[in-house]
Regions:
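Flexible, low-complexity charged segments
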Residues: 1-136
Length: 136
């Protein structure tokens, strides 16, 4: 909606009925980037927003949201090794130059969604967020 005196941006909550998905963290990852010498690392935490049929994430109470997250985590547990493999494969193929620009991060986001979506057949990925993204 605007900026506060402290410089923080305030945004309005999504309109009622708009599905922002149910957020599910894929955990923290530390990987070597594909730079020559292999001395550059990426530490990231990725959060997916998943559309759950019949559920509008933005309308859930905190308790209902936690229940949905627990249910999703349990349903994703059998494919967690494949999810982790995709994350590792995609992230370790990137160089520092490819992931340091806003355009590079957006391309990485799109590639991860394209790579993960076939595995998550019954859930549409509505967003992928880098809760943490540190290059060293």
């Amino acid at each position: 909606l605007g900026n506060t005196d402290a410089g923080e941006t305030i945004t309005a909550p999504p309109p009622a009925g708009v599905d922002v998905g149910v957020p599910v963290t894929l955990g923290e990852r530390v990987v070597n980037l594909a730079d020559p010498g292999g001395f550059r690392y990426l530490k990231t935490e990725i959060v997916l927003s998943l559309h759950v049929p019949g559920v509008v994430g933005s309308e859930l109470s905190t308790e209902e949201l936690e229940k949905q997250q627990a249910t999703l985590n349990a349903r994703l547990e059998p494919i967690k090794p494949q999810i982790q493999d995709i994350l590792t494969s995609v992230l370790t193929a990137k160089t520092v130059a490819e992931v340091t620009t806003p355009e590079g991060k957006e391309a990485l986001r799109e590639q991860l969604i394209e790579s993960l979506q076939p595995l998550l057949r019954q859930y549409q990925i509505t967003g992928l967020y880098f809760a943490q993204f540190v290059i060293q």
